[in-house]
Amino acid sequence: MAEEGITAGGVMDVNTALQEVLKTALIHDGLARGIREAAKALDKRQAHLCVLASNCDEPMYVKLVEALCAEHQINLIKVDDNKKLGEWVGLCKIDREGKPRKVVGCSCVVVKDYGKESQAKDVIEEYFKCKK
């Protein structure tokens, strides 16, 4: 699970950093969304980071993604909710007030290209260094 309370230098927790990284990667066309795109990116070793929803309703998806990440030594983060993950990676409509609506759940996302160097990327990388 992506712990919420972890702060790197008291600046940004892992969930906030993850949202920033996903947003930047989305802008730079560096995301593979959904199990098919994600599995292809993982298999081709194009992935820097994989994000998996804990509430994925298909256990074989989870096994496949976890196995591919383990096989190719790709960092894996789990988030609580597939709707939240779908919102973070742009699988929704934004209404006039800027609030997301018609959010589509997304069980798996792979970051193929971070887009640019950022503090959020450093926080995520530091998180994985601490986990090892």
Curated annotation (Swiss-Prot):
Pfam families: Ribosomal_L7Ae. Keywords: Nucleus, Ribonucleoprotein, Ribosomal protein. It is found in: Nucleus, Nucleolus. One of its GO terms (biological process) is positive regulation of canonical Wnt signaling pathway. InterPro entries: Ribosomal_eL30-like_sf (IPR029064), Ribosomal_eL8/eL30/eS12/Gad45 (IPR004038), Ribosomal_eS12 (IPR000530), Ribosomal_eS12_CS (IPR047860). Its main location: nucleus. It comes from the Eukaryota. GO terms for molecular function: structural constituent of ribosome. Part of the small subunit (SSU) processome, composed of more than 70 proteins and the RNA chaperone small nucleolar RNA (snoRNA) U3. Subunit of the 40S ribosomal complex. Part of the small subunit (SSU) processome, first precursor of the small eukaryotic ribosomal subunit. During the assembly of the SSU processome in the nucleolus, many ribosome biogenesis factors, an RNA chaperone and ribosomal proteins associate with the nascent pre-rRNA and work in concert to generate RNA folding, modifications, rearrangements and cleavage as well as targeted degradation of pre-ribosomal RNA by the RNA exosome. Subunit of the 40S ribosomal complex. Belongs to the eukaryotic ribosomal protein eS12 family. This is Small ribosomal subunit protein eS12. It comes from Gallus gallus (Chicken). The gene is RPS12.
